[in-house]
Curated annotation (Swiss-Prot), chain B:
It is found in: Cytoplasm; Nucleus. It comes from Arabidopsis thaliana (Mouse-ear cress). This is Transcription factor PRE6. PROSITE patterns: BHLH. The keyword Transcription applies.
Amino acid sequence: MASADKLINTYVPEKDVFALHFLQSLSNLRTQNPLNSPDKSIDRVRKIKKAAYVSMARAAGGTSRLWSRALLRRAAKDDNKSVRFSRRKRKVTWKISSKRKRSNQRAPVVEEAAERLRNLVPGGGGMETSKLMEETAHYIKCLSMQVKVMQCLVDGLSPK
Amino acid sequence: MSSRRSSRSRQSGSSRISDDQISDLVSKLQHLIPELRRRRSDKVSASKVLQETCNYIRNLHREVDDLSDRLSELLASTDDNSAEAAIIRSLLNY
């Protein structure tokens, strides 16, 4: 059983870590665009949404989680930048060959549901099913934290 | 059990996860999802948990969308409905 002793860590930082990252992100949005306010509200919403996901990924551990790495990579690609990742000791495969995934089949009905999950979790496409579930647990915790932060902000800004 | 493990460890250098850990992960997921937390019985199947997880994630994404929308509106508005709102807006450079 020695090889199965991998600790499954789903530690998530406190809400104020997420809040701080998000507020910084939001205030940066304005300093990037001080004089000309984006005309289209759709652009504004898109930028805020992106700030939410990126700040969430950073608050949750940046490049130490597969889903946050995938999220940050995706966001950086949008901006035509590149993300610097520290070299990980474990070999990271960017593409899991289909042969490997197939060899890891759990019950087919579980695999089918896992496939749908892979499309929802950032970076899920290359993950083994068990890793996918671990990442999903962490992703869900962080997402709900981020939602709480945003709700607080909306409540603060709303008319009393 | 050991024969299963050895046949799997052939494929890669990473440690193999046992089926026990899979069901452990499934139950962890189950606790995280509000829908399923209410039915604390262990009778929820793994595929049901994964299915509900998908729904939950989709809902969370939708909430982020909705809240982003409202935030954008609220930040852009110039009526200072409350002192708190004015403070927050000035903090964020709006």
